[in-house]
From Swiss-Prot:
Protein name: Replication protein E1
PTMs per UniProt: Phosphorylated. Probably phosphorylated by host PKA and PKC at Ser-109. Phosphorylated by host CDK1 at Thr-102. Phosphorylated.
Placement of covalent cross-link Glycyl lysine isopeptide (Lys-Gly) (interchain with G-Cter in SUMO): K514
Gene3D superfamilies, per the entry: 3.40.1310.10, P-loop containing nucleotide triphosphate hydrolases, Zinc finger, large T-antigen D1 domain
Enzyme class: isomerase
Species of provenance: Bovine papillomavirus type 1
Highest taxon of source: Viruses
Bias kind Polar residues: ranges: 592-605
Region (Disordered): 90-112, 582-605
Catalytic activity entry: Couples ATP hydrolysis with the unwinding of duplex DNA by translocating in the 3'-5' direction; ATP + H2O = ADP + phosphate + H(+)
One GO cellular component term noted in the UniProt record for this chain: host cell nucleus
Gene Ontology biological-process annotations: DNA replication
Leader sequence segment: none
């Protein structure tokens, strides 16, 4: 065959083919280097075709690793170049490598910029353009300044100090001079001061329209110089917001990072802060929405600024007496709230002795109220309490409750008439019965209407647990046990009678008063206990046997102050209060207005 390959050997020679086909080391040494490589490669290729299971041919990888490293290096250089353009905004980088790499793309982008120069969206989306003449150069400079400011904020060791310094250099005023300090981001406030650094002009103008819907007053101004740009906002929201909420709102609205914001509540007490905002509002570069807040007008108006506010303690006492505030915490809180409309309250907040004034005011009000209460007769006092009750009520709810307990209302009215007069041996009413029969509900509603006090037997080991009897017209001891009744039988027989008793008061001398009418609720029937024999004549009992809770555990009866008001008005004559009421009206005591402040009505200036 013409294409027959391989060696020709004679089969009669036996194993002599081994000598013919074998490779010798001496042959390789005599061969040329290039020829040896070619022969070995060719031999390996031929051998690999005949391999059956194990491939011992040599493998050549080529330069794949070098190509991979070259591609990685090129991709890394492109990423670094893009990062420099985004962070630094360098015109040299954008006009250097990028212009040399894609000149056609640059020319197209520049042509698009010239065709659509009036479109604001293109200016925002493509801020980095080749510097040209006019508007394009100015826009590029602004973007470069913003990027440079962001870079300074990132590189600065103390970003807060850098922002405070930039704010003071632009507005010639410290940021802390116009703001207060809130340490908790959850504290809510309506008036906030915001400083934004590196804000683009398009977002500054758009934020004015977006924030007007959420604010009752909005004032904003933006300034810039070679160090960067800063915009300051005074925002009075319609509802109180926390710093965290305002920060998220403004960061999304202005499209800036939270690191570029400084946010604190407005300083409403300070002439310098008010003048700063008032002067800024007069500038034509300031955008303003709504009327100036009251705290700015009050401190910048000529009359208010020249007027010297002096605190008058008597005016404060008169205010607390008119509102019936006798607790120190209530007086302090409510009078601080009145500072917006009361000049004396503002002067009170400016004093350094607020705690002393509040304590003295509460003491004086308690003295006045106690003397006023003791000066009134029981009919006049009940009439005054009826004026304080609001709403519409019906005396029939009380009638229905007594009928439900199988008690005649006329019996309760006769006992109540003697109880209100404080007649001896009729000065204590006890409501006896099993639990959940409405005893405490009835007595607590009556004591609340009369403005009485509640005594807790848990404090009986204290010498002063009866001190509140000196300042009240009626008292209640709820859920009296055997220990309480034994205490009454041992120490308070004259108090149950309604005779004068001596009351020990803390840090004061003991006072002698007539024991006020007393209500007692208990599960123990005193009349059936022989051990309380001496209390039988001193206590008038009413037994409640019917439970006052339905299947769901709720109480169907609810007696309010308006119901007691209707009850007393309806049964005023039957309670024998007419004569004393007419006498008080003729004397004019009930119509007299009490004045505890030094009002100089006839003074001559």
């Amino acid at each position: 065959m013409a294409n027959d390959k391989g060696s020709n050997w004679d089969s009669g020679l036996g194993c002599s083919y081994l000598l013919t086909e074998a490779e010798c080391e001496s042959d390789k040494e005599n061969e040329e280097p290039g020829a040896g490589v070619e022969l070995s490669v060719e031999s390996d290729r031929y051998d690999s075709q005949d391999e059956d299971f194990v491939d011992n041919a040599s493998v050549f990888q080529g330069n794949h690793l070098e190509v991979f490293q070259a591609l990685e290096k090129k991709a890394g250089e492109e990423q670094i170049l893009n990062l420099k353009r985004k962070v630094l905004g360098s015109s040299q980088n954008s006009s250097g490598s990028e212009a040399s790499e894609t000149p056609v793309k640059r020319r197209k982008s520049g042509a698009k910029r010239r065709l659509f120069a009036e479109n604001e969206a293109n200016r925002v989306l493509t801020p980095l353009q080749v510097q040209g003449e006019g508007e394009g150069r100015q826009e590029l400079n602004e973007e470069q300044a913003i990027s440079h400011l962001h870079l300074q904020l990132v590189k600065s060791k103390n970003a807060t100090v850098f922002k405070l310094g930039l704010f003071k250099s632009l507005f010639l005023c410290s940021f802390h001079d116009i703001t207060r300090l809130f340490k908790n981001d959850k504290t809510t406030n309506q008036q906030w001061v915001l400083a934004v650094f590196g804000l683009a002009e398009v977002f500054f103008e758009a934020s004015f329209e977006l924030l007007k819907k959420q604010c009752s007053f909005l004032q904003m101004q933006k300034r810039s110089h070679e160090g960067g740009t800063c915009a300051v906002y005074l925002i009075c929201f319609n509802t109180a917001k926390s710093r965290e909420t305002v920060r998220n709102l403004m960061a999304n609205t202005l499209n800036v990072r939270e690191e570029c914001l400084m946010l604190q509540p407005a300083k409403i007490r300070g002439l310098s802060a008010a003048l700063f905002w008032f002067k800024s509002s007069l500038s034509p570069a300031t955008l303003k929405h709504g009327a100036l807040p009251e705290w700015i007008r009050a401190q910048t108006t000529l009359n208010e600024s020249l007027q010297t506010e002096k605190f008058d303690f008597g005016t404060m006492v008169q205010w607390a007496y008119d509102h019936k505030y006798a607790e120190e915490s209530k007086i302090a809180y409510e009078y601080a709230l009145a500072a917006g409309s009361d000049s004396n309250a503002r002067a009170f907040l400016a004093t350094n002795s607020q705690a002393k004034h509040v304590k003295d005011c509460a003491t004086m009000v308690r003295h006045y109220l106690r003397a006023e209460t003791q000066a009134l007769s029981m009919p006049a006092y009940i009439k005054a309490r009826c004026k304080l009750a609001t709403g519409e009520g019906s005396w029939k709810s009380i009638l229905t409750f007594f009928n439900y307990q199988n008690i005649e209302l006329i019996t309760f009215i006769n006992a109540l008439k003697l109880w209100l007069k404080g007649i001896p041996k009729k000065n204590c009413l006890a409501f006896i019965g099993p639990p959940n029969t409405g005893k405490s509900m009835l007595c607590n509603s009556l004591i609340h209407f009369l403005g009485g006090s509640v005594l807790s037997f848990a404090n009986h080991k204290s010498h002063f647990w009866l001190a509140s009897l000196a300042d009240t017209r009626a008292a209640l001891v709820d859920d009296a046990t055997h220990a309480c009744w034994r205490y009454f039988d041992t120490y308070l027989r004259n108090a149950l009678d309604g005779y004068p008793v001596s009351i020990d008061r803390k840090h004061k001398a003991a006072v002698q008063i007539k024991a006020p009418p007393l209500l007692v609720t208990s599960n123990i029937d005193v009349q059936a206990e022989d051990r309380y024999l001496y209390l039988h004549s001193r206590v008038q009992t009413f037994r409640f046997e019917q439970p006052c809770t339905d299947e769901s555990g709720e109480q169907p009866f609810n007696i309010t102050d308006a119901d007691w008001k209707s009850f007393f008005v309806r049964l005023w004559g039957r309670l024998d209060l007419i004569d004393e009421e007419e006498d008080s009206e003729e004397d004019g005591d009930s119509m007299r207005t009490f004045t505890c402040s030094a009002r100089n009505t006839n003074a001559v200036d």
